[in-house]
Regions:
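Bacterial Sec-dependent N-terminal signal peptides
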Residues: 1-30
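Acidic (Asp/Glu) and glycine-rich low-complexity loops/linkers
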Residues: 19-112, 116-131, 142-151, 159-167, ...
Length: 238
């Protein structure tokens, strides 16, 4: 009897969600973000589709479904970080939230939830820090600089190309750093859980792999400084 009641409640809740989703007004609204000329980093929360482009002139524009009109928070703070947030609402998809951002350089990217960041162009700079959580993803980001620092959690995925003098990668859960076309001289790496990393290293790597994590690499680097535990592994790819 108890199991039947739970099942009925689950069906009712699903029906309410589906009915609510059908009635949502998905007419598209859009607006320009003020102070876009100061953007040097992006913080994304929720199911946003972000299109990040490299360009000499900075600009930022958002497009969202009408039912989210009073729930969207998009602004640039005094430190030059563009915040893209949305208050919790049932039935949000990435088709409901879109941002187009054009900036000369990028120093910081943080994304959570189910946000996707798609990149065009080549970004150059001294340092770049990336933090991805949940099911967030970065696709086709090209970066050339001195340092890159990447932290991945949950089921996040970072797809990058480019080059750096030094790279640091920390990945947990089932996250993935898909970077075979990113070349670094030195790598500091920490992989846990079932996380995976693929990168090109030319000189040396240090760090620790645990759980069922896996590091694949190209290049002739010295990896004797990488410790292995559990079922973790290192594979050289020709």
């Amino acid at each position: 009897m108890k199991a039947k009641s739970i099942f009925c409640l689950a069906v009712f809740a699903m029906s309410v969600m589906l009915f609510s989703n059908c009635k949502k007004d998905r007419t598209k609204h859009s607006r320009e973000i003020s102070n876009a000329q100061n953007i040097r980093g992006i913080v994304v929360e929720g199911s946003w589709s972000v299109y990040l482009r490299q360009g000499e002139q900075s600009s930022a524009k958002i497009e969202y479904s009408a039912f989210l009109d009073d729930k969207v928070d998009a602004r640039v703070d005094n430190d030059g970080y563009l915040y893209l947030k949305v208050r919790r609402s049932i039935g949000i998809t990435r088709n409901d939230l879109k941002a187009i951002v054009t900036i000369p350089k990028i120093e910081y990217i943080k994304a959570s939830g189910a946000s996707h960041i798609n990149s065009e162009g080549v970004f150059e700079g001294k340092a770049n820090k990336i933090e991805l959580n949940g099911a967030s993803k970065i696709n086709s980001l090209t970066y050339r600089g001195n340092d890159i620092d990447i932290t991945l959690n949950g089921a996040s995925r970072c797809n990058m190309s480019g080059e750096a003098e030094r790279a640091k990668i920390e990945a947990n859960g089932s996250s993935e750093a898909a970077m075979p076309d990113f070349t670094t001289k030195t790598l500091e790496i920490y992989l846990n859980g079932s996380s995976d990393a693929f990168i090109t290293i030319t000189e040396r790597a240090t760090g620790k792999l645990s759980g069922a994590s896996k590091l694949r690499y190209r290049g002739n680097a010295d990896l004797s400084g990488v410790q292995l535990s559990g079922a973790s592994s290192i594979q050289k790819v020709e």
